[in-house]
């Protein structure tokens, strides 16, 4: 950027140009929302807004909300209340609420927080800049909630958070009917992107230096049953084929995916995981409960034996795979015997870690109407027992890693104590978090680089590697991070809206 020399009058036209309005996106909930927030940021930047710096009050605050848990409502409306005095003092400030809670509450958002300017649903991400302009011009709050998907969010511009790792959405929505989950009613039925579109986005990211991608969907192993493009044939084996295709992309070093459903987890996916070198040896597969009776009540169309059988086959094919899960404690009607069944499955499964939740009653879900709602004190006591069991298992599994050589993708923001301990942090191929001593190479190692080191210690939630790096490889991702560059995608990838793609243009002679 050119700097103004001392004593030289600035160009008057530049002084007359108003400073760009700034924005901040606050994200709650799952990885889908994190990825959607990258799209929201990309849209706002494309529209001329600038991301607000740390500690700076933004002109526009966007909430990308979650509706899965009860405290999501409390968190949103509490934060909106905190912004009310700012809005009153500065009417030009704008507040937008999107995501699953906006889709669910709709006009209720304005009744509860009338100072909000824009409410937009899960299918209206692309409308945000227009809605902000309209609200500012008309001085009237704008509400836009579409009932079905009109275009894939992945066709929108994205402002990625990381130079070295990226989300890639392969589907939107869900066809399952879990009784505790409100997501299908808010995000709609599953719609799958064409494999070529997914791979084009992956290639675009790799071309910009990204080393790791995570394929994202509510139920990734149902991929292929409901393509948006009606000319794309239904293919139950599409997800395994997609994994193998990712393995053929030069420069893509790590592939992860989340989340599969146990009822649709097939052996072709296990084979693809084992035979595709850049697919990471890790699996996150929600269990929810170890009780067959509770699984039936949840409408989870598998049973504990099937779940454990999948894990056994994964570990046979990939011996060092780290397996993680989601668990719900206190589902309506859960008895002590049901809860003990969950503890038994957790003990047998030997998860490396687990996301554990106390059941939260959500209006609009079948489970909210079930008899046998469990007292909070009972749920809390069971939750604590489950946490203690999983902490013990996680620590035992992590201690088993001591002495093992690990390859780390160096990360930023993963180690809260890195500055105090003179360590850096990275993720092993199996997803474990490792805090490592950089040794004499410290000044040369950047986030996005690859380091090989040996595990010397363990805690329940991380590993320690204080032996110093045995290898360090500088990468294009590390270069990009050092230069402050993050990849941009979503424009020019040939990604269609919903429906068949436009016909290809007629070419003369040879065309590549």
From Swiss-Prot:
The MTTase N-terminal domain, residue ranges = 21-137
Q: Which residues bind [4Fe-4S] cluster 1?
A: 30, 66, 100
**Radical SAM core domain location, by residue?**
160-397
Going by the entry's taxonomy, the superkingdom of the source organism is recorded as: Bacteria
EC number in record: 2.8.4.3
What are the UniProt keywords, alphabetically? Answer: 4Fe-4S, Cytoplasm, Iron, Iron-sulfur, Metal-binding, S-adenosyl-L-methionine, Transferase, tRNA processing
Instruction: Provide the top EC class.
Output: transferase
Gene assigned in the entry? miaB
**Protein name, as recorded:** tRNA-2-methylthio-N(6)-dimethylallyladenosine synthase
Q: How is the cofactor bound?
A: Binds 2 [4Fe-4S] clusters. One cluster is coordinated with 3 cysteines and an exchangeable S-adenosyl-L-methionine.
Give the start-end ranges of region Disordered: 1-20, 470-512
User: Any idea what job this protein has?
Assistant: Catalyzes the methylthiolation of N6-(dimethylallyl)adenosine (i(6)A), leading to the formation of 2-methylthio-N6-(dimethylallyl)adenosine (ms(2)i(6)A) at position 37 in tRNAs that read codons beginning with uridine.
């Amino acid at each position: 950027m050119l700097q103004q020399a001392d004593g030289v009058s600035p160009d008057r036209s530049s002084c007359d140009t108003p400073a760009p309005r700034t924005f901040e996106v606050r994200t709650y909930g799952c990885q889908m929302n994190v990825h959607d927030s990258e799209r929201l940021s990309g849209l706002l930047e494309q529209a001329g807004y600038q991301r607000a710096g740390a500690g700076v009050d933004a002109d526009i605050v966007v909430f990308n909300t979650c509706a899965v848990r009860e405290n999501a409502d409390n968190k949103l409306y509490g934060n909106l209340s905190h912004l009310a005095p700012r809005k009153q003092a500065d009417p030009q400030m704008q507040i937008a609420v999107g995501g699953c809670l906006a889709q669910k509450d709709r006009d209720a958002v304005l009744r509860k927080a009338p100072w909000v300017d824009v409410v937009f649903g899960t299918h209206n991400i692309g409308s945000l800049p227009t809605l902000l302009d309209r609200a500012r011009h008309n001085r009237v709050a704008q509400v836009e909630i579409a009932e079905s998907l009109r275009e894939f969010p992945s066709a929108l511009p994205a402002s990625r958070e990381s130079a070295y790792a990226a989300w890639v959405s392969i589907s939107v929505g869900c066809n399952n009917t879990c009784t505790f989950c409100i997501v299908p009613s808010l995000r709609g039925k599953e719609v799958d992107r064409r494999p070529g579109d997914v791979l084009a986005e992956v290639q675009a990211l790799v071309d910009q230096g990204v080393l790791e991608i995570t394929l994202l969907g509510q139920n990734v192993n149902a991929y292929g049953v409901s393509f948006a493009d009606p000319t794309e044939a239904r293919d139950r084996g599409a997800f395994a084929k997609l994994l193998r295709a990712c393995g053929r992309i030069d420069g893509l070093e790590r592939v992860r995916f989340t989340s599969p459903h146990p009822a649709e987890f097939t052996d072709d996916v296990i084979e693809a995981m084992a035979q595709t070198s850049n697919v990471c040896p890790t699996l996150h597969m929600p269990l929810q409960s170890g009780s067959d009776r509770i699984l039936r009540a949840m409408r989870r169309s598998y049973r504990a034996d099937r779940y454990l059988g999948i894990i056994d086959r994964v570990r046979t094919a990939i011996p060092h795979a780290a397996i993680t899960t989601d668990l719900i404690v206190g589902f309506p009607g859960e008895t002590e015997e049901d809860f003990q069944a969950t503890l038994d499955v957790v003990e047998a499964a030997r998860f490396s870690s687990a996301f554990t939740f106390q059941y939260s009653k959500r209006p609009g879900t079948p489970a909210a109407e079930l008899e046998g709602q469990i007292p909070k004190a009972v749920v809390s006591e069971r939750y604590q027992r489950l946490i203690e069991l999983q902490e013990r298992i996680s620590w035992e599994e992590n201690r088993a890693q001591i002495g093992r050589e690990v390859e780390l993708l160096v990360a930023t923001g993963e180690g809260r104590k890195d500055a105090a301990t003179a360590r850096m942090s990275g993720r092993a191929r199996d997803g474990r978090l490792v805090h490592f001593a950089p040794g004499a190479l410290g000044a040369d190692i950047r986030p996005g680089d690859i380091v090989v080191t040996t595990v010397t210690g363990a805690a329940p939630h991380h590993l320690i590697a204080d032996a110093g790096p045995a290898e360090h490889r500088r990468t294009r991702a590390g270069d990009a991070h050092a230069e402050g560059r993050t990849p941009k995608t979503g424009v020019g990838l040939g990604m269609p809206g919903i429906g068949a793609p436009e016909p290809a243009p007629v070419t003369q002679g040879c065309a590549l």
